[in-house]
């Protein structure tokens, strides 16, 4: 059996992240969010990039977009400067996720997007950061603290980023009138696919 200290830390983690999501609504900007949704809904292609935990969350976002038939892909910062940004064309959208807003690996991607006429949506906690100031739209990522006792691991910050991604997808489903019948076609696998493709459901 693990120690009571460890169990208490686990319980506290739930509280920390629940508090974060609840408080995030206080930083919700209808104007910025509407602009982001409009750009994403009208883009032919969507890219997403970040480093570390932010990068992993961006991979999740790209899949969320594909699940509502918006062509998207995660662009690794390493591959981006070796031709990977060729995926994006004028009028497309690039998501840059960086809690501090100063991830140097993302600066070249920003420059390329600006040169190609690709709109940039930055998600960051620091609205005065370089990546925020150069973006077309900035979405605020609020983080109360990480769940570990040292406040160092990318835990709550990842949850906050994913919450923004989930909110974007939810809004886009409404804005584009995406139907479950469409999803059923591209998701025949697993329990979800079985439920979607079951007659009468």
Identify the residue ranges that each predicted region occupies.
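Residue-level preference for alpha-helix termini and adjacent loops
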Residues: 20, 27, 32, 80, ...
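An N-terminal, well-structured beta->alpha segment
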Residues: 2-42
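Glycine-rich phosphate-binding loops that contact phosphosugars or nucleotide phosphates
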Residues: 45-176
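Internal, active-site/partner-interface "lid" segment
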Residues: 133, 147, 173-201
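Alpha-helix boundary/capping residues
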Residues: 40-43, 95, 190
């Amino acid at each position: 059996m693990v120690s009571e200290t460890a169990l208490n830390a686990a319980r506290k983690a739930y509280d920390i992240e629940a508090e974060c999501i609840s408080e995030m609504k206080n930083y919700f900007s209808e104007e910025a969010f509407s602009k982001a949704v409009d750009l994403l809904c009208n883009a032919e292609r969507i890219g997403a990039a970040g480093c570390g935990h932010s990068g992993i969350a961006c991979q999740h976002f790209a899949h969320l977009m594909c699940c509502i038939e918006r062509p998207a892909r995660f662009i690794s910062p390493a591959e981006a400067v070796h031709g990977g940004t060729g995926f994006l064309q004028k009028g497309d959208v690039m998501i840059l996720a960086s809690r501090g807003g100063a991830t140097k690996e993302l600066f070249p991607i920003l420059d390329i997007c600006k040169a190609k006429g690709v709109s940039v949506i930055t998600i960051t906690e620091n609205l005065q950061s370089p990546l925020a100031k150069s973006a077309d739209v900035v979405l605020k990522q609020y983080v109360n603290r990480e769940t570990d006792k040292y406040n160092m691991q990318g835990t709550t910050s990842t949850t906050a980023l994913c919450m923004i991604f989930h909110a974007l997808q939810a809004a886009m489903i409404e804005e584009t009138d995406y139907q479950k019948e469409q999803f059923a076609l591209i998701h025949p696998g697993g329990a979800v696919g079985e439920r979607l493709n079951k007659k009468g459901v």
